[in-house]
Amino acid sequence: MVDVPCFVGIDVAKAQLDIAVRPSGERWAVPNDASGVVTLVERLQALHPILIVLEATGGLERSATAALATAGLPVVIVNPRQARDFARATGQLAKTDALDARALAHFADVIRPTPRPLPDAQTQELRALLGRRQQLIGMRTAEQNRLAGTSERLTQDIEAHIAWLNARIATLDDDLETTLRASPLWRENDDLLQSVPGIGPVCARTLLLELPELGTLTRQQIAALVGVAPLNCDSGTLRGRRTIWGGRAHVRTVLYMGTLVATRFNPQIKAFYQRLLVAGKIKKVALTACMHKLLTILNAMLKHRTSWQVQEVQN
C-alpha cells in the first residue's frame, strides 16, 4: 500500500495540541505536556507527513517543535498573522482550535514554507536572555510613565522598583555578554557588527539572535524579512506611495534606534541621510532609507566577513 502524501497542522494552546491532517481530514488532540508530545511524535512518524506547520505562540510551541524536529520530521513555525490571513482568504472566518489546525494543514499544503533547522541550545539560551531583557525594559518604561502625577509615597515605591529593574537589566546584560563572548563565532560576528558606528551591543546582539539569516540572504531578501523594503501600491496609471509593512517588528525597532545614532556618527549613513533631506525627502522617509542602507551594509559585512573599514571603502 502506497502512503498518501499528507500535511499536518497543529494548533497550540497551553493545555492541549489540536492536530489536523490533510487530505484525510483526520483530527485529534493531545495534552500539551511531555506525554502528549511523545504521543504526537509517535502518531506523526507513522504518517510520514511532507510538512508540519505550527503557529508561533509565545513559546508554548517549543517543546512540541523540538521533539518533532529531533524525530526528523519536517516542521515549520509560521507567523500567526500570515496563517490567519490565509484562513480568511480561503473563506474560513470562524475561529476554533480545531478549525485553526485544519487551516494550518491547508496552509502547509498550499504555501509549503521551507523547514529550517532549529537553533542550537546556546542560541536558544541567548534568545531567552534577550527576550527577558526586553520584558524588563518594558516594565521599566511602564513604571517610568507612572511617575508623573503620583504621590510622594508612590513615587518612592516606583523609583525603588525602577532601581531594582535597572539592576536586573544590568545582570542580564552581563549574562548575555559572558555567554556570547564564550563562542568564537558569536564573538567574531558581534565584533564585526559593533565595528559599525551606530551599532551598539544591544543592536548587534538583537540582530544576531533574532535575525540569524543576516549574512545569508540577498539584500532584497533581508530587507523584506525585516520589513524595510519599499512596497509598491500601484494600479493602472496610478503610482501610489511606497510604504514598508510587516517583517520582524522588534528587529526593525532596534535597527531604527541604531540608524538614528548612525545618522550622527556614521560618516557614510550621515552623508546619505543629508543627501536625502537636501533632495526634499521628509525625515521619516529618509530615516527608513537609511535603515535599508545600513541593513544592506551589515548583511554584506557578515556575508563577506569584512570589517567596517573595508566595507566603507567598497561602498
Which role does the model predict for each range below?
Residues M1-A167, T263-R264, V285:
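Phosphate- and other anionic-substrate recognition elements at nucleic-acid/protein interfaces
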Residues L104, L136, L255, G280, ...:
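A residue-level signal for conserved active-site and pocket-lining positions in enzyme catalytic cores
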Residues D120-Q124, R153-D157, N189-D191, G236-R241, ...:
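Short linear capping/connector segments at secondary-structure termini
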Residues Q144-V202, L211, N266, K270:
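Helix-hairpin-helix/helix-loop-helix acidic hairpins
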Residues P201, T206-A279, K283, V310-N315:
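Phosphate-backbone recognition surface of nucleic-acid-processing proteins
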Residues V278-N315:
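Basic, amphipathic alpha-helical segments enriched in Lys/Arg and hydrophobic/aromatic residues
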